[in-house]
Regions:
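Conserved N-terminal phosphate-binding loop of PLP-dependent enzymes in the Aspartate aminotransferase
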Residues: 3-310
């Protein structure tokens, strides 16, 4: 890797040392060196090898600036994290006001904020939702979803789509594509995770009819897959199969939720009422890490029975 780092450093333009980050304490060159040495050398180098030498400095609204001053419109938005733009003034103001009195709290006790946010999520979700459990990221929220459907059904198998991605945490990673999990030996037990082709209703039924599947998890629009749109009626057909064979449907709305598709939740376009909705990214406003698992009374019955275990 040393030679690659050298090649990257050699590309930095003359005089770049004089360009400072925000408060003037760090140059772009120093930031590059730190990322290569202490953060993620492969990811950093890969983008530079493609000619994309961005080190993000200032960010505001739907734009950010490279440390060399070049302005970019952010159409990526971190998968919806910045639905409201970078450093949205209303979000910043709410957090600044909140930290005058609040901190992370205590996981044993309720609070005004937890109760109000849970109520807002439940009441704006699809019909039948009852509970909202909070996490710090989308992957963790998927883990909660998988734990919930396993508890509710007393089954263990999780079915997902080929080429899917649901997060880098343990259970979420095991439900994802081999590209993300196999290198880390997180493939999970084969008998508990299975993937089927997208839009293949027959393949889905072939797995579900064994009546040993706890949950089917599907991104309403599979993002890491390349944003293919499900064929009309596919998601509704999957939900019908879930109901037929006693399986719970998890809608991964981390990227498609919170109005990003024009409706509060992307699954609403399909006329499907899932048993679980997973939310994250944009829920944080891009400032405070928070995600949520929204569940029906059936899917979330552990909350009533063994709520202290989480």
């Amino acid at each position: 890797m040393a030679w690659r780092r050298k090649s990257l450093r050699g590309r930095v333009t003359a005089g770049l040392e004089d360009i400072m980050l925000l408060d003037g304490s760090v140059t772009k060159q120093e930031a590059i060196n730190d990322c290569l040495t202490y953060w993620n050398p492969n990811r950093t180098q890969t983008w530079f090898d493609m000619g994309i030498d961005i080190i993000i400095g200032k960010r505001e609204g739907y734009y950010f600036w490279d440390m060399d001053g070049k302005k970019y419109m952010n159409l990526h938005l971190n998968g919806g994290t910045f639905n409201l733009g970078h450093r949205n003034p209303e979000v910043i103001a709410a957090l600044e006001e909140g930290v005058k009195e609040f901190d992370i709290g205590n996981h044993h006790f309720g609070s005004v904020a937890r109760g109000k946010l849970a109520k807002s999520l439940v009441t704006t979700a699809t019909p039948g939702m009852q509970y909202a459990i909070f996490s710090s990221c989308g992957g963790e929220a998927v883990d909660v979803a998988i734990k919930s459907v396993r508890y509710a059904t007393k089954r263990r198998k999780i079915v997902s789509l080929q080429k899917c991605y649901h997060g880098h945490t343990g259970l979420a990673l095991s439900a994802g594509d081999p590209f993300f999990k196999d290198a880390f030996l997180c493939d999970g037990a084969d008998q508990y995770y299975e993937q089927v082709p997208m839009n293949d209703v027959d393949a889905m039924e072939a797995v579900l009819k064994k009546e040993d599947v706890a949950g089917v998890i599907i991104e309403t629009i599979p993002a890491t897959y390349g944003f293919p749109i499900p064929e009309p009626g596919y998601l509704k057909a999957v939900k019908a199969l879930c109901e037929k064979y006693g399986t719970l449907y998890i809608a991964d709305e981390v990227q498609t939720g919170l109005m990003r598709t024009g409706k509060m939740w992307g699954i609403m376009h399909e006329g499907v009422n899932p048993d679980v909705i997973v939310s994250g990214k944009g829920l944080s406003g891009g400032i405070y890490p928070v995600a949520a698992t929204i569940m029906t009374k059936q899917a979330g019955k552990w909350v009533e029975e063994i709520g202290r275990s989480h």
